[in-house]
Amino acid sequence: EAEGTYVKEEYEMEEAVITGIASDTSEVKVTIRQVPDAPNVAARVFGALAAANVNLDMIIQNVSEAGFTDISFTTPGADLPRAKETMERIVPEIGAREFIVDEDIAKVSLVGTGMKSSPGVAARAFSTLGENQINILAISTSPIRLSVVVDGAQAAAAVRCLHKAFDLDSDSVFEETQLSAEEIAAKMNKGR
């Protein structure tokens, strides 16, 4: 055989839309009820949380009704004592009615770089969860991640049904991980 360079045809592999699913049960959700819908209120709330060194993940604000709104956020469970202390002080200061804490939640994230160029991922995920009687409590998106908050007792069922809906093999599922979606995506892309 002759020495030299062999030229072969290169085939691009199709990029998977969803490459992994992560479930994180370590977060809690805090909701501030009947917050006056006025300028600077959110800044005061989240400024106070930042000053107390409370890490935030998802933030949700409802549509204003009769001049009031609800604001919810998720935070690591380890930050809950500081979050509660901050809420006990800031809720009366801003004129909100109350705050409530839900410690039995799970964040389920679908991760994949193909999401940014594939319409319909959210619709498929939401339909799958709905068909399995899993209620979505909050939603967050980025170009490579779709996260939903569900009842903690439904976390495993959510992961299973989404796993099936997106045809993922079992090696792609990271249940109850402490990794962020970006860390999971990096880990999965490293194996390619």
Task: Tell what function each PLM region has.
Residues 1-192:
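C-terminal catalytic "cap/lid" subdomain
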